Amino acid sequence: MSEKLQKVLARAGHGSRREIESIIEAGRVSVDGKIAKLGDRVEVTPGLKIRIDGHLISVRESAEQICRVLAYYKPEGELCTRNDPEGRPTVFDRLPKLRGARWIAVGRLDVNTCGLLLFTTDGELANRLMHPSREVEREYAVRVFGQVDDAKLRDLSRGVQLEDGPAAFKTIKFSGGEGINQWYNVTLTEGRNREVRRLWEAVGVQVSRLIRVRYGDIPLPKGLPRGGWTELDLAQTNYLRELVELPPETSSKVAVEKDRRRMKANQIRRAVKRHSQVSGGRRSGGRNNG
């Protein structure tokens, strides 16, 4: 069955659907030797040859690919880009290496924001989770500096005008602090550039700390250190897929990796046991010879 080229490439982890549409429009993709056009359809067969910038890439049928999702604790100071000309650290630097696919960030966090950032190997999943029409909730813990009164909170809930259109917090809840340094938990259902900061600035309040603590129903994992990542299990992955109307997965890499770690641990234990037996035998032999 044929599928849109950008969908096949997104599913294979070569970028979000929006990114892939851009590289197709730029003439950087060829199918069986012909420059591809936006809207082209392909059927994934063993003989299919797709190239990006002249490099042959790997694509597989939907049923052959396992969708993987990581939860990453982004520290402040890291950029949401694959490569930085100035050599600054990026969110991709610490992620596990992949063969035949790549990690795609589900949205962005600005350099001064820390917290939960999801990554997936499925570009279609990333695209749908980011799209405003899906209205997936993002929750942030915000420390603000300035006087916050009921009128400002009312404006933030009802909506204020930003340079790229009206915006509002879906929910806003006081969560601690005293005087002019206070913490709030806020939620949005879209991911415009610096939207949380710009909303507060629109009512004359500065954000001094910003942490994303939840995406949909996936929280920032407890105990995860900054710069650390953990892979979501099958139930969590399928929650995200069903949230954006994608078919559920039937298997997960998480179980496979756990089995591999268990086998490795067993191998180490057996090796240690053999070493102990050999060493013990040598010691015993040494005493008998004496």
From Swiss-Prot:
* Gene Ontology molecular function: 23S rRNA pseudouridine(2605) synthase activity; RNA binding
Residue ranges for the region (Disordered) are 256-290
- Enzymatic class: isomerase
InterPro entries per the UniProt record, alphabetical: PsdUridine_synth_cat_dom_sf, PsdUridine_synth_RsuA/RluA, PsdUridine_synth_RsuA/RluB/E/F, PsdUridine_synth_RsuA/RluB_CS, RsuA_PseudoU_synthase, S4_RNA-bd, S4_RNA-bd_sf
Q: Reaction(s) catalyzed by this protein?
A: uridine(2605) in 23S rRNA = pseudouridine(2605) in 23S rRNA
Annotated GO biological processes are: enzyme-directed rRNA pseudouridine synthesis
**PROSITE patterns the record matches:** PSI_RSU, S4
For this protein, the record's CDD domains field holds: PseudoU_synth_RluB, S4
Give EC number(s), comma-separated. Answer: 5.4.99.22
Q: Which residues form the active site?
A: D110 (nucleophile)
Record-linked PANTHER family: PSEUDOURIDINE SYNTHASE FAMILY PROTEIN-RELATED (PTHR47683), RIBOSOMAL LARGE SUBUNIT PSEUDOURIDINE SYNTHASE B (PTHR47683:SF3)
Which family does the record claim for this protein? Belongs to the pseudouridine synthase RsuA family.
This chain's protein is named Ribosomal large subunit pseudouridine synthase B
